[in-house]
Amino acid sequence: MTEETGNDFQMVQGYEIVPSNEEAHAEEVQGDELVLAEDLAQGDEVQVNGLVSAEMSTPPTSRRRRKKSLVWEHFTIEAVSGGATRACCKLCKQTFAYSSGSKIAGTSHLKRHITLGSCPIIKNQEHKLALTPAVGTDNDGEGTVERPSKRRYRYTGYANAAFDQDRSCSYLAKMIILHDYPLHIVQQPAFTTFIDSLQPRFRVVDVETMEGEVYAVYQKEKENLMQAFSTMPGRISLTIGLWTTSQTLGYVSLAGQFIDSEWKIHRRMLNFMMVSSPHSENALSEAISTSLSDWNMKDKLFTITLDNDCSSHDIYSANLRDYLSNKNNLMLKGQLFVVRCYAHILNAVAQDVIASIHGVIYNIRESIKFIKASPSREEKFAEIALQLEIPSTKTLCLDVTTQWNTTYLMLLAALDYKQAFSTLETSDDNYNEAPSAEDWKKVEAACNYLKLLYDSAHSIMAAANPTSNLFFHEAWKLQLELSNATGHEDPVFSSIAKDMHERFDKYWKDCNLVLAIAVVMDPRFKMKLVEFSYSKIYGVEAAKYVKVVDDAVHELYKEYVAQPLPLTPAYVEQGDGNNAPASENGTQATAPSTGDGLVDFDMYLSEIATSQPTKSELEQYLDESLTPRIQEFDILNWWKLNTLKFPTLSRMARDILAIPMSMVSSGNSIFSAGTGTRMLDDYRSSLRPEIVEALVCAKDWLQYLPATPEAPSTTLVKVDAP
C-alpha cells in the first residue's frame, strides 16, 4: 500500500512499512552502496529456494499509483525520441527499454541486471556485503543497538554464500597441495590471523587433521582417474623416475601416458612409492607390478621409459622385461618394452662435451666474473670491443651449472669476444685468465656440437605434448651428424665427436626400432623416411636394417589383428549405413539378390572375392600416397578421422604414438633433466610415505581441473536483514 505525500511515500515491504526518503534509504543499506535484489513489487513473483511465491497484493485504489518495485531505487526513467522511455541504471548508466507508447516492458529484465551481477559496479562491490548481521548505532551515535529485523530478499552470490567448514577445509588442502605449502602452515600465527580476518567462523584445523584432508583430496581424485582409466580404449606406457632422500630410503615415481577416446594425449602421475632400495633390480620391478595392480592395468601395459642415470640401465631393462613379461602380455615379445629417455641422453652427451673442456670453461667463468665485478671494468671491456669493431650484440653472463644450455650460450657469447679478452689481458695487469688460441679452438668445437643438441632439444620442446613420431627426426639426424664428425680432419673436433658418438650410438642401437615404428605411424612419412635415413646412416647395409623395421611393424600389426576389435559407439555412429558388411577376410560381402535375375552374377562376385587376395589395413596404409607435409599437421586428429578406415591399425597407432620418448613433461625444462640425482627435500622426507604420495600425485591431478570452484547458487533467498 502506498500513500503519496509530496515527494515522500511509504511502501509495504514484507511486514514493515519502510520510509522511502533518503534518510530511510541510507539506514536500509547500512553504509553499503548497494542493496541487491530488493526489487519486490505488488504482483511481482520471486523465487525463494527454488519455489515461486507472490508478494501480497494491496487493495485497489482510484489514485494513480507510483512505481513501487524496489528496482526503481536503482533506475531512473529517461525520455527518448518517439515518445518512448528507457530505464537508466544509476550505477553503471546502462539503459534498458521500458515503454513505447502504451506498451510497458515491465521490470523483470531490470531485476536481472541488479540481482544476477550483470551490473559491473555491483559486481565489483559485491565483496562489501556483510555475511553476518551488522550492529548499528543509535541516532546520537552513542552505544550500539540491534536494529529490528526486516524481511528482505538478497542475491546469493559469493558474498552471501552459506559458510561450509568442510568445503573450506577441502579448498585449504588443495591450496597446500598445489603450491607446495608445508602442512604446518595451519599452525603459523600469521596464517591463522589472516584466515580469521576473512572468515571468523572458520576453525583452523591441526596438522594431523590437515593430513586427513589432503589424503581425502587424493583419494577422491584417484577414484575419478580410475574411472577414466576404466574406459581407456588403448594401452598405457609408463615413465619411471628414481628419487633419493637424506635417509636410507628412496622413492619411485610412476607416471602413465595414454591417448583417450577423443585422440588427446595425456600424462598423469600414478604413484610415488617409497622403496627401501630404489636402485635394486627387484625393488623397481615390484614397484611397477604393485602400481599396475593398484590401478587395474596389468593387461594394459605397453612400454616403460627409464632415465639414463647409470651404467645399470641394461640390468634394469633385462630384469624388468623378464619380471613383467611373466605377468603381462607384452607386445612384440617385449622388444619395445624398455625405452630410454631422449632428454636424458641429450643432457648426458652435453655433459660429456662440457667435461671435455672443463678447464677452459673455468677460465671463461673467471673472466666474466672479473669483468662484471665493477662498472668501470664493464665499461673498459665495452670500449675494447668497440675499438676492435666486434659486431656481436651478445651479452656476457655466467651460466647455471645445472643447465647445460646456459653454459652453451655463455661459451657462444664469449667466443665472439675472444679478441677482446686477449686485449684486456695485455692492458690490465690484474687480469690473467684469458683463454689461449688452442683453448678457443676447443670452445669453437664444443659450441659446434652443443648446437646440435641445443637445436634438437628446442625442436622437442616446441611441441606442447610431443607424440613419439617426432623423436625419430631428431635422433636420426643427430646420429648421422655425430657419425660423420668422428672423421673430422681436426683432432680437436674429432676427439669431442668420438666421445659424443660413443654415448649416443648406444642409445640409437637400443631405441632406433621403437623410434622407427613410431615414425611409420606418421602418414607423412611411413616407411619412406626410414628407408631414406637408414641409407644415409648405414650405406650399403641399409636394406638389412630397413627389413628389421618392416618385419617388426607387420608382426606387431598381426598381434593387434589377433585381438578382438571392440565395437564402440563411435564406430556405429560414424559408419556408413549404405556400405555392405565386411567379411572375416576383410573383403566386402555381397548382399543377396533382390529378384533381379542376377543370382549367377552374385555367385560369381562371391567367388572372386574369396579367391583374390585382399590387402590388409597395414598394406593399404603403406601403399597409399604420403599425406602432404604441412607445418600445423595434427597426427592425432588424422588418426581420429581415419579410425573407421583403419580400425585395427588405428588401435596400434594409438598405443605407439602414446609412448613417452622423453620423461620431461610439458612445461618443464629439458636442459636440466638427468643432470643430477633427484633428491626429496628434508621436509617431505619427514612425512609419512602415504602423505608424500598424496601430495605429489594430487598436485599433478589437480592442475588439470578448472582453476576456480563452481560458483555458488544465484537464486534469491529470503533472509533476515539487520
Curated annotation (Swiss-Prot):
Residues 617-702 are annotated as: HATC (Hobo-Ac-Tam3) domain. Keywords: DNA-binding, Metal-binding, Nucleus, Transcription, Transcription regulation, Zinc, Zinc-finger. Disruption phenotype: Reduced plant size and amount of seeds. Zn(2+) binds at C89, C92, H113, H127. It is found in: Nucleus. Residues 576-592 have a biased composition (Polar residues). Its main location: nucleus. Residues 572-592 are annotated as: Disordered. InterPro entries: hAT-like_transposase_RNase-H, HATC_C_dom, RNaseH-like_sf, Znf_BED, ZnF_BED_domain_contain, Znf_C2H2_sf. GO terms for biological process: post-embryonic development. GO terms for cellular component: nucleus. GO terms for molecular function: DNA binding; protein dimerization activity; zinc ion binding. A zinc finger (BED-type) spans 66-134. PANTHER family: ZINC FINGER BED DOMAIN-CONTAINING PROTEIN 39 (PTHR46481:SF10), ZINC FINGER BED DOMAIN-CONTAINING PROTEIN 4 (PTHR46481). Homodimer. Transposase-like protein that is essential for plant growth and development. May regulate global gene expression by recruiting other cellular factors. This is Zinc finger BED domain-containing protein RICESLEEPER 2. It comes from Oryza sativa subsp. japonica.
